[in-house]
Structures are given as structure tokens and as C-alpha cells.
Amino acid sequence: MERIKELRDLMLQSRTREILTRTTVDHMAIIKKYTSGRQEKNPALRMKWMMAMKYPITADKRIIETIPERNEQGQTLWSRTSDAGSDRVMVSPLAVTWWNRNGPTASTVHYPKVYRTYFEKVERLKHGTFGPVHFRNQVKIRRRVDINPGHADLSAKEAQDVIMEVVFPNEVGARILTSESQLMITKEKKEELQECKISPLMVAYMLERELVRKTRFLPVAGGTSSVYIEVLHLTQGACWEQLYTPGGEVRNDDVDQSLIIAARSIVRRATVSADPLASLLEMCHSTQIGGVRMVDILRQNPTEEQAVDICKAAMGLRISSSFSFGGFTFKRTSGSSTKKEEEVLTGNLQTLKIRVHEGYEEFTMVGKRATAILRKATRRLVQLIVSGRDEQSIAEAIIVAMVFSQEDCMIKAVRGDLNFVNRANQRLNPMHQLLRHFQKDAKVLFQNWGIEPIDNVMGMVGILPDLTPSTEMSMRGVRISKMGVDEYSSTERVVVSIDRFLRVRDQQGNVLLSPEEVSETQGTEKLTITYSSSMMWEVNGPESVLVNTYQWIIRNWETVKIQWSQDPTMLYNKMEFEPFQSLVPKAARGQYSGFVRTLFQQMRDVLGTFDTVQIIKLLPFAAAPPKQSRMQFSSLTVNVRGSGMRILIRGNSPVFNYNKGTKRLTVLGKDAGALTENPDEGTTGVESAVLRGFLILGREDRRYGPALSINELSSLAKGEKANVLIGQGDVVLVMKRKRDSSILTDSQTATKRIRMAIN
């Protein structure tokens, strides 16, 4: 108190005030504080003080030639005294203004190209629509989101190589551009940025924005695609939200969305094939999304979704260590358990064998519309705290948690038999049986669970079996919270294994994913998905199956022809004919197949009846298991366009039309390709001409291996023998001539010899 009084008295004296405001500071410690080191101690003050001077800026001497000494108002722009300690000129801030208005202009053509992401953002905002603001409590949960719209999906290393190649092509250092996308982007950017005067560092920084996905762990309530995240600060606060529709889409969001749709279709299709894992890999490798190979996208894209992760696991890529159950992503946050097989009885006295997790564990559960914290002991739910968008979403989370807890009262709540099957008609495992049962109807489950009185805890309410909120009572252990549960933030990826039924396990043997977890939701992909695999032909309906089957036969006609004559059974078993069977009326499949196979056998036996067009037309029908019958058909029926359409055994029809003039085939009016050989002339002339230089020895001799096509003969050495398939579908044994002189006579003798060899 004394000191303060003393200070007050001092301040009353005018001399004190003068010392404090006018005199220079000359205390050594203070001078030292502000002058030692290169670091500016008070940047704001320094700036104000500098700008108050007449010439605070220094510039290169050349500036004198470019800028007049005075501007239009007659104010001086630079001083004739040079800067102390350097050979630069002292310049006024007014010179900057003059330069901005009258200085030289550079070409602006590169700006939209280099700053593409900014220009596009402005366009999106310009065309976006902002709706009303609503005030309400926001349940935000932290999710890993993409904060950088419009990027490609290169890894940091790949992008670095591209940037070095584009911006600093002459720098030393090994750069390996391997992936298709790397090469494409490099080529495109080099062309775009010719003669570019923007500083290379800036170009490099902007390129990085364009090439690499940047993610952040942010609190979000609502859309998570990058075009929503870029306006997150405008669309949601602590207690308000503003509705917003983006004014444009970006390719990276479209890739993510289309990838999920493709992966789901592929997993669903693979599940019903004989070898799901092999089929899945075949489909992933032959599918393109927006013109890019799906396997390349899977390697680069960090999207975490059940089907996508199954595809990644099949390719041997690492995936997140969290597991999926009932459409929720579970992450164990503490505790541990051991697994033990146990037999339990349902309320219907059906025995189920379940793998019980023994031990206390805590999990976070994150779904699309609800999140929860689950604490459980051995076959007992200790506590479940749920938050969700609506009653329905909250109920979904509660059902999944109750089933996951494996409590006895849940198993006893089963009414009726459990016999759910997957798409391949295989019974689901017991945990998924229970889940499906209660997802259909959870009334008994909630009624039998039991209720308890609850304490009043801030931000939490109880929930009754009829799903109404209550502050007094709640289903045992279950509470509803206003706060969401954050998604698991770690981006750590683990090595996993996958079995042929597409069950994905971590290295401890825990099942992380299985096809039962793949959503049935169908959507329309934003980018074109091209499934080249025959297994996916049926995705686009019966017409696509029909056209694709015939296109495939024509594309592979050379090898199909050989198999047709030598090993028809192997040909009939080709998976490319599988989808076609669903178009043939069930009752007729076996009879059609038997009839066509008999017809084909006659063609093989009787000389001169080999008819390429007819073989192509009827081949898919021969793939079904044949029934022996005496039935003859003049046409075969296929179910397309909602009704049965006829394919004529002899001649054209709207379904199958071969034009002799153009040699092209149209199926249902769609072009299915051209036949390279002429199917109507028995092709003897053509074949015998090709056989010049070969001696025909006689009938086929199996010791010389499978029949070669005419095209493959050229690889034979002189004197070497081989079986060869000739036009009528017959096989003969030939030897390549040792001398070239006698070639001329070959084509005449060949024709005679072929006839003899066959007869």
C-alpha cells in the first residue's frame, strides 16, 4: 500500500511525467533486450515505426529505371540517398502503389491453372445455396475427414516425385514415375505450365494441394464429403446449423462414393460364387472406376468402409484394426478378453454355438446415424451410452450392443426358429442370426431386458422399452446422451488375413469383417463403373448379359473354336456362360442343353456341317447340365425385356442377327462384334492357302499335343509336326516342310489331302 501511495505522489510531479514520456531509455539491460539477437522482439511496434518514416523500403538499384521519381501528385517515390550498409535504394510506400497501378503486367494465363483449387472453390461457393439457420443442440462427433476438395489420390512420395519432375525437371535425384496416374498428371501439368512465370515454390505448394489427400480429425454433424468440410465453419456452430447445398461436385468425393458402390456390388456377387475370394480378386482386377483401375484406387484411397476394406484385405493391403458388427465400427478402448466356444439355448430351445468373449472390455461404437460407448463383462452388458439422430437410429445401436453383449436374456428373447441365410443360401453364423432376428423385431428383447431407476446425471436421460425418454427409469445399463462419441482417430493400419469366404481376421485371429457386414444399400455411382468381369454382367440386367456373352465368344473365337472341337466339356464349364443361364427358362435349361450338345456332336462327326454362326449362337445354351431327351427345337427362348424372346436355330431373329454382308453380329439391336473368318464358305479355300509350306500327314495324332490354330503354326520349326484345327472344325496332323521350293504345290495337294485325312 505504501509503495502505491509513493508512486501516486511521484506521478503528480510534472518532472516524473516528462521523464517517462520524453526522455530516451538508456538503461543497458533494456537496450540489450531489444537489440541482441536477430529475432524481432516487437514486430508490430517495429512495423508502425518503420512505416512512419518517409522511405521505409529498400529496393534493387534497377528500380530507378522502372519507376519515375515522382508520381502524378508530385510525391517523391524514391530517395537519391542509398541505404546505409548496402547498395540498395530507399523507396517510399507510394512506389508500391504506383507499381501496382502502372507497373508491367505479366501473362495471367497460368493463374487459373496453378491456383486451380482456389478458382474452383470460388465457383462452388458462387453456385452453392445457403438455406435458413436453425438453432438447436448439435451432436457433433469427431471424424477423419478430407479437407481438400478436388485432389487426386497420390501418396506423399508419389506426389513429391511428380512435383519434382514438373517444377524442377533439371534437379538431380532419382525420380521413379510408375503409376498410370503419376504419368498422366506429369504429362498434363508439364503441358499446362509451359512458360509459367509464377514462382516455382508456389507452383510446388499448389500442386501438392492438388495431388494429395489431406485429412483432419474434426467435429462434424452432417455431411462429411470434402465439399461440405470446406464450409464447415459456415454451416455448424455449437448451437446452430446453416443448411447448405454445394455448388458443384469434386472428383475425389465421386471416387470415394463410386468406390464404395463398386466394392459392395463385387463383394455381394463374390459371396454367391463357388470360390468367393478368387472371384473377388478377379473382379477387382478387371473393374475400372471413372477410367482408372479399381486396384490402383484401392491402393491409394484411404476410405474405410466394410466392402472396401474386404477388397483391400484380399489384395494384401493393410486396413484399420477396428472391427465391424451390425453396421457399426467397434474399437476396443480398454480391457481384454479370451474366446471360448459355448452352447446356448434360445427361447425356442434351439441350440446355438457361440464364441463367448470372457473378460471386461470397453468399446466405442460408431455408425452412420448413431454412436455409443459400450462397457461389457462376460456375457453381460455393464453400461451403454448412446447418442443418435433419431429414435430409429438409437434403437439400431441398442439392438447391436445387446446382441454383442451375448447376455442370456437376449438369447432367451428369441421367438421362433433362427434360419437366416446369406445370398449364397448358406446359414449365417449364430451372432448374425441373432442380429437379423432382433433387427426385424426387437419388442420382446426390449421388454425382457429389464428396467432400473436412474440417477439424475447432466446430459443423460433414460430410455424405456417403448423407446420413449424418461428421467426416472431406463432399460438396464442403457442411457441416452446428448454428446456424440468420437470416431477412432488413429490412422494406424494392420496386417490382416482373409479366408476364401471373405472373412477378414487380424493376426490374433479376431474376425474384423465378413460379407454379412456389407451394406445392402444400393446407390447410383457418380463415376462410370466398368465391370469387365463376366460375373458382373448381370448387374446391368438381362440385356447386358446377353450382349456381353456373345461379345465374349466373338472376342475369343480362335480359342473357343479349338476347345469346341477338342474339349467341349471344358468349354461348357467356362464361368463366362454362368450369367446366361439365368435368362433361360428353368424348365427348359437341361433339354436345350442336351439338344444343342447333340447338334454339336453331329457337326463334329459329319463333314462340311461346321457352321460358325450357328455354333456361336447356340453355344451358351450348351453350358447347362444336359438332360437326355428326344426333343427337337426350331427356336430357343430367352427371358429378356420382361418376356420370352426367341432365338431361331436356323436363321436370324431380333435377339441374334448376323449380317453376311458386313460380317457383323447384332444382339437385341446392339453391335456384338465382327467375325474375322468367313463362316459360310466352309473356309476350305482360306485354310488350304494358309497350309502352304506344310505337309498334311493325316488325321489328328494326340501325341503331338493339343490342336493349334492356323495363326499359331508360324512358330513351328522346319520338320516339326503338330495338330492343327482347320475351317470345318476338323483336326489334322501336319509337318512344316524342310525345303521351301515345294511350297507352290501345297495349296493344290492340301485341299485333296484334307479331304482324305478327314474321311
From Swiss-Prot:
Top-level division of the source organism's lineage: Viruses
Gene: PB2
Family that this chain belongs to: Belongs to the influenza viruses PB2 family.
Gene3D superfamilies documented for this protein: Polymerase Basic Protein 2, C-terminal domain
Coiled coil segments of this chain: none
Role according to the record: Plays an essential role in transcription initiation and cap-stealing mechanism, in which cellular capped pre-mRNAs are used to generate primers for viral transcription. Recognizes and binds the 7-methylguanosine-containing cap of the target pre-RNA which is subsequently cleaved after 10-13 nucleotides by the viral protein PA. Plays a role in the initiation of the viral genome replication and modulates the activity of the ribonucleoprotein (RNP) complex.
Subunit text: Influenza RNA polymerase is composed of three subunits: PB1, PB2 and PA. Interacts (via N-terminus) with PB1 (via C-terminus). Interacts with nucleoprotein NP (via N-terminus). Interacts (via N-terminus) with host MAVS (via N-terminus); this interaction inhibits host innate immune response.
Places the protein is found: Virion; Host nucleus; Host mitochondrion
Motif Nuclear localization signal: chain residues: 736-739
Site (Mammalian adaptation): K627
A single GO BP: symbiont-mediated suppression of host cytoplasmic pattern recognition receptor signaling pathway via inhibition of MAVS activity
Name under which the protein is recorded: Polymerase basic protein 2
Stored InterPro entries: Flu_PB2_2nd (IPR049110), Flu_PB2_6th (IPR049114), Flu_PB2_C (IPR049115), Flu_PB2_CAP-bd (IPR048298), Flu_PB2_middle (IPR049111), Flu_PB2_N (IPR049106), INV_PB2 (IPR001591), PB2_helical (IPR049113)
Keyword tags: Cap snatching, Eukaryotic host gene expression shutoff by virus, Eukaryotic host transcription shutoff by virus, Host gene expression shutoff by virus, Host mitochondrion, Host nucleus, Host-virus interaction, Inhibition of host innate immune response by virus, Inhibition of host MAVS by virus, Inhibition of host RLR pathway by virus, Inhibition of host RNA polymerase II by virus, mRNA capping, mRNA processing, Viral immunoevasion, Viral transcription, Virion
Alphabetized GO MF terms: RNA binding; RNA-directed RNA polymerase activity
